[in-house]
Amino acid sequence: SADTTIKIGAKSFSESKILGELYALALEDAGYKVEREFEVSDNLIHQAVCDGQIDMYPEYTGTSLLTILDQPMETDPQVTYDTVKEMYAEKFNLDVLDMCEASNGNGLSMRADVAEKYGIKSISDLQANADKIRFGGTSDTFEREDGLPGLEQTYGTFKFKSKNTFDNSLKYQAMANDEVDCVPAYTTDAQLSSDEFVLLDDDKHFWPPYNIIPVVRQELIDAHPDVAEI
């Protein structure tokens, strides 16, 4: 394995880079040389692994299913994984290794004081009280099927008091500064551990599961089957 260099990719947000680094360290421990490509944009990373510019990277089952494979929504984690694994092998010659129980799902986060004031615990509650709530998100939030347009198909129209667009990294700051009351969140966001913000219950199960999966080029697994075990 000493003469094999494995190129590990990651998307440009922190959780993806941390996962990529965990893969890299595990492979280095096993005696492989590793190159790290940790700033790949979301829309290029799949093509990069298909083209062999990288050998593996961490992905999420829900992203694979909806965005890459353009398949219909599925809420069962195992069905989602099985579909992705099968179709990746068939279409892209990519191997999807075992999924991780950790799931970085999509959700909506609110200022805790505002949620309490209006008795909002779930996304259905939010929809019923939307006219009192200032909502903010990225441009993707307002355009993508796994954003507001899709939410409205499941929950009905959200007649928000106002809608603001800003960069993803500023969303919790915008809530803390009292500019907005509700923003899209990842269920693993560190800010949700504070008392200031709450995650709303996706009571109609709109979002699919987002379990972490290592996506690997099949050629690499064929040449080095032990990589799958590491």
Regions found by a protein language model. Give the residues of each.
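Ligand-binding cleft/hinge of the Venus flytrap
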Residues: 23-30, 123-161
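C-terminal lobe and pocket-closing loops
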Residues: 183, 189, 194-229
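Short helix-initiation/N-cap motifs at beta->coil->alpha
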Residues: 14, 35-47, 139, 161-173
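A conserved helix-loop-strand patch within extracytoplasmic ligand-binding domains
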Residues: 77-135, 218-221
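Short helices/loops that flank or line small-molecule/ion binding pockets
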Residues: 25-26, 43-54, 149-154, 168-183
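Ligand-binding "clamshell"
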Residues: 68-97, 179, 191-205
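Beta->alpha turn/N-cap motifs
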Residues: 38-42, 52-65, 80-81, 111, ...
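Short, well-ordered beta-strand elements
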Residues: 2-15, 23, 32-37, 131-137
